[in-house]
Design a protein with these regions (language model features):
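Alpha-helical transmembrane bundles and membrane-interface segments of multipass inner-membrane proteins
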Residues: 1-208
Length: 208
């Protein structure tokens, strides 16, 4: 049995993650009220929130800037994967990490680009509808990212004069998880590949 080409493997990973991410987001968006929470276990909840910012609900800069940044980053990652897919200097694991990061970036880009057009507004009292008659809640590139995974892994009480705190509060989605896993594994096990191009460039300059 022939080994799957790295390029095809990356494409499959990207497609599977994007499809799973979008199916989950559409289900949550059309089945939950905004801020509604569903307890799966004592340490894992589905908690529907929307954010206009970056991964894990972080807000930085304008909405248009963030969306354009995501689009450019996704395009650059796709180009990098295409260029190195058959390069033996880069391991399969490294390309898988890039594919996960790319899939996560594209998954959130889709929300920003189209969700404002194809959904009406989610509120604590009304569920959103896909392709509503009155149109969407925002213009192109101004959609909100749907988040739902919440892991309150540990909790404790501070003194009475301090607020109650919960460890790991950010709510995130499958796309965020793909980006995080790809980045963590990349840094822990494949960081040496990030300097391959730089080292090759230096060697070529010395040989001139």
């Amino acid at each position: 049995m022939r080994k799957l080409n790295n390029g095809y493997l990356a494409a499959i990973i990207i497609l599977v993650v994007i499809i799973a991410d979008q199916i989950l987001k559409i289900w949550v968006k059309t089945s939950f009220f905004l801020y509604e929470s569903l307890d799966i276990t004592s340490w894992f909840k589905l908690n529907f929130v929307e954010n206009p910012g970056m991964a894990f609900g972080i807000e930085l800069g304008s909405k248009m800037f963030l969306t354009i940044f995501r689009i450019v980053a996704s395009a650059v990652l796709i180009y990098i994967i295409y260029k190195i897919r058959n390069n033996k200097l880069y391991s399969r694991g490294f390309i898988v990490c890039l594919a996960l990061i790319t899939a996560g970036a594209i998954g959130n880009v889709i929300d920003c680009m189209f969700y404002g057009l194809i959904f009406n507004e989610s509120t604590p009292y009304t569920m959103a509808t896909l392709f509503p008659e009155g149109g969407g809640y925002a213009s192109f590139l101004h959609g909100k990212v749907v988040d739902m995974f919440y892991f309150p892994l540990a909790s404790w009480y501070w003194p009475d004069w301090m607020p109650f705190c919960v460890f790991f509060q950010p709510v995130f989605n499958l796309a965020d998880a793909a980006i995080s896993v790809g980045m963590i594994v990349l840094i822990l096990f494949y960081s040496k590949y990030l300097s391959i191009h730089e080292n090759n460039t230096e060697k070529s300059e010395v040989s001139k």
